[in-house]
Each structure stands twice: as structure tokens, then as C-alpha cells.
């Protein structure tokens, strides 16, 4: 039977480089010696013997003994006449002469919980219809593309009255409904929680027993393929949560798989997570590396997944994560960095980057570990994006404050930009922030009912304007009151309520504007993409800033489009070449609106009837969006000469309490003559405090290369 698991297969697996090992391990319907059946292979290096047990053989360990493949630790067998949708496990005889029964680590399908068996299935003959999506993804620059992620837990997004499946929605219906909802609202991607098989609903999918099996709660593996296909055809990307940090101790799972530590480290100081009561993968063992790396690639290859969001990265990087002194072992240099996990990430992410097909990988990393999103060649870990947990913490702390006291916490909203370019960040308001007595987003807001919604609108508007990609958890776009629970659907009935419907419409209009105007997203990771107009108006708790397109340009005195100050054409570069490369030179015709965007946000209920905002030179600014939503009619505000916010021009706008304003404008080349009309000043006490804060901010910027580590 060596023709199934060849010598080359064994070698590559042994050195951790068999990136399609899932084509060999697990259960594979096939024909052998003229007979149809299923081939099985499993790695159990400490086992005395392994047998295939199933419904077919009465779960008898003596019925289908497996053959050891030399000294590889691999066992294999072929069972004739076995087909799809049959339950099976591996019976493993340990060194203590005890039989233990395990689900297939490489199993493609699992029994519906509470059952724990693996299920045979054939993944080879699904017909995909997303070729156009996959081809377009290859050409897309993900850094310069819109990314507004809708985080979804399928088990509680919607429930059906299906008692056989405990009300779980089918993959196909979820795909259709999510595609319709995301396109209606303006989301670009869904991020799906809990897709890999897990026995306990309350783990939310973060204690995985079937890394290669889409959960059977919603259907079969091919049903999940169909869901991805539906979303891709609708233009929606699909990101999965992926959990290589730890796994549960369930008897049928990976823990002590062959009677001894197999996938985990044998030393509990390295192999067990004290806070979560779970096992930690042994990242230094090549076969374990291979299991995880091939698993990541499996989701990209077989399921056309667009991205993986890696959970709990910090717990993998630090040997002392969640441990007291004496409970952890330092690395060979005496430090607390997990060198094996670091190399694992570099190995994994270098492979994903080399695919060059638009596949992305995202880190949920909660510390200031440096260079998460730098390439491995540059000394980084190689992730494409990182969740910005620091921004989230500061944002929520500020938004919870009574507006009366927000002036004392003004810098919480501005601090994020001081390190915004240290990594390629995604701003997140995830499921973790609306559980465990943290309250939902709307319940975090201060004030009476109407004020809470006004606050949340202003906060979301600030978030969408801030540099970085974006993520929002389900239910928070219409102001769900209750905390999230995996056991029930989110409260869709709230869309019938006035304030909830108003917030929902507000978010829909804002998200569509986000996708329509490239200045929102195209230069998220470029210094030119964001500039404060006034970051220091703490006394009035007002923020104003500008977003530009990448390589934005200004209108010259002759009326021609000219390269922006940081984007002059190279001497050897022709105008036509500039256009083809999208560099922003003269005569440029790019997709989308060329305008820059001005954001103004009032975080108090105090109306400012004639609020001046500093501006670059421009003829006028078009009002696009307010606290009421998308502007219903075209309205332009003149940009006039007069110093304000350190700029030579300004516009004046009547800013309501909790008011917001979004303007589009085209920058023009400025004249050099002096201005004659100064910006209206605050009273002397406000001005003194503002000047002091400016100086502190200036000094802080001089000394803090990365403020989160200072």
C-alpha cells in the first residue's frame, strides 16, 4: 500500500514541508486494485497499533487493523466497499495497552454534535462559479482596497425553526442572506467565527477538535463550499477565524492523541494554557508544524477562502503568557519569546505571501510585539494586517465618558495616529467587546436614549474616517441593546424601532460612501493619507482631519492637475507611464472620486453655530454626509482666505450637538501672500490649555518612536 504514502511523502512530512499533506492523511474515497472504497491514513507515532473502527464494522478494533508505514509513525489502510457519509474513528492501542478512540485529525467532515465521530466525504468534485472573483483578487492591491469587515457568528446571526439542527441556519441560506445583507449595507468581507468543528457551542469555535472539518452544525463541507461560492459571486470576501494557539482536552480530540503528548509539548509549562485549560501545540515538532501550515493552505485551496484571522497570537509569542514566575520556561537566550512559534509564523506567512493570489492573513495580537506586518525577509512575522487593540481600548474608553468630561480625555482619540503606521492595522469593534458584562455598543454610550444613538453615530463616523481597515461585529450596526450570546439570534426585530432603524440607515449610507470615495481607504498605510486639521480642540471636544487618495494631486494655477507635493514625477517617467502605474501625475484618470475628504466630529451636545475649520486652498467643499445621514441635496460651502488651525484657508459650518460633517474638495496650489482674517479664538483659558497640550504632544512625538512601547 506504499503507493498511497510514498517515500517522498514521508520525507516531506517528516521535515514539515508537505504542504498538501491533507491529500494523503485522513479519509479518501478511491479505487484500489479494482475495488472502490476509502483509504485512511493517520499519524500516531507512540501507538502500538491502530485500527479503523466504524459503523460498518461495529466499532470493532480487530476488524480493520491499519498497517504501520515503516518508522514514520503513520498508519494506513484501505476499506473496500466503504463510501461517503459513513461514521468512523481510529482505535489506538497505547503503550499502556489501552484502547482509546479518536476522531480523525485530518477528517474533512464531523458528526453533528454531541456525536464525535468523523464522517467520510469526497471533496474533489465540487463545481466552483467564482472564477471571476478569484482572478480579480489576484490583481487587487489589498492595502489600497476598501475593507469593511462584518464579523459574524453563524450560529447566532440568524436562527431557523429546524429542531433537527437546533435551529442552525444552513450554509446555503447563510450565504444567500449574508450576500444580500452585506451588499445592502456596504460591507466588503465577512469574517466567520466558529467554522472549524468544535464540540462546545459556548467556546464560540475557539476550542477546535476538527481543524479540517467545517462544522456540521450548518451542513456538509460541500454546503460550505457553496456558501463561499455564493458570497464570491456577490462580490463579498470570506475570512475565517483560525485557532493554531491551543486545542481542547476532549477525549476524542488531539490531546494525548496516541496515549502520549503528540500534538502538544510534553512539559505542561510549554504544553498547557493555565487560563483556558487547553493544550498548546508543539511548534518545534515538524509534523505538528506541517499539520497547521497545511491546514491553513487547505482552507485557501479547497474552500477558496480569502483570508484567515489568527486568534490569540500573543499567547503563542510569549512563553510567560498567562503564567506566574516559576510556571514557564525561558528560551535558550533566557527570554520570554517563543522562538519556535516565531519561526512557525515566519514559515507559514512566507508561504502565504508567495502565493501572490490575494490570499491574506490577519493577526489578532494584543501587545506591542514589533513588526507583525513586516515581511519575514525584513525581519517581521509576515502577517498582512493586525487588529488594532490599542485603538479599540482608547476609543471605547473615550466613548463611555460623559461628554462633560471628554475634554480631559481628548488625546485618547488622537493617540492612535501617533503609531498608526507602525503596522498595517485593522480597527476593530469585535465580539469580544460586547460580552461578559462589557455591554453592547449602544449600552456603552452615555446619556438618554436619543443621546446614546447620537454618540454612537459620531463614534462610528470617527472610526470610518480614521486610517486603517475596519471591522464591526454583527448587531452593532443597528444598536442591539443586549450583549451577544451564541445561544440565540441577534435582535433583528429592533429594525422596526425608530432609533435603531435610523442608526442602521446611517451606517448603510456611511459604508457605501466609504466604498465610493477612495480617499477613505486607498492611503490607509501612507503618511499622506491622513492629516489632522485640529487634533487639539479639547475644550470643545471637536475633531477634524483630512483623508487623501494615494499620490493625491493639487490643481495648479493654470488649472491643470499637478502631482502633489510628495508625488512629483520622476525625471525619467513619462506622463503616460505615470497614468498606467496610477502614480497621480498630470492628466491622470483613475477609478473613483479624486477628491480629498474633510471630517468634522463634535463629541458633545453643545451646538457650534459658526465653527471654522482650517482647509487647504480650494474653491469650495461639497457636503456629503451629516449626523442625519447622506446629504439629500447638493450643498457647497465656500473655502475662503483666513488663517485657521495653522492653515491659510478655512470654511465655516454650523455644527450641531453631536454633529458630524463630511466634505469632499479638490486641493489647489496655494498663493504665497499673507492672510488677513484670523480664525476665531477660544476664550483665554481654553487657548492656554490648548497651547499646553500642543507642546506636550509635540514633545511626545519627538521621543516616542512607538508610543505603545514607550
For the regions a language model picked out, list residue spans one by one.
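Conserved alpha/beta catalytic core and glycan-binding cleft of carbohydrate-active enzymes
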Residues: 304-306, 324-486, 494, 515-521, ...
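Carbohydrate-binding surface patches
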Residues: 36-48, 534-560, 565, 570, ...
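The feature marks proteins involved in alpha-glucan
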Residues: 1-35, 67-151, 156-163, 173, ...
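Substrate-binding/active-site clefts of carbohydrate-active enzymes
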Residues: 131-144, 153-337
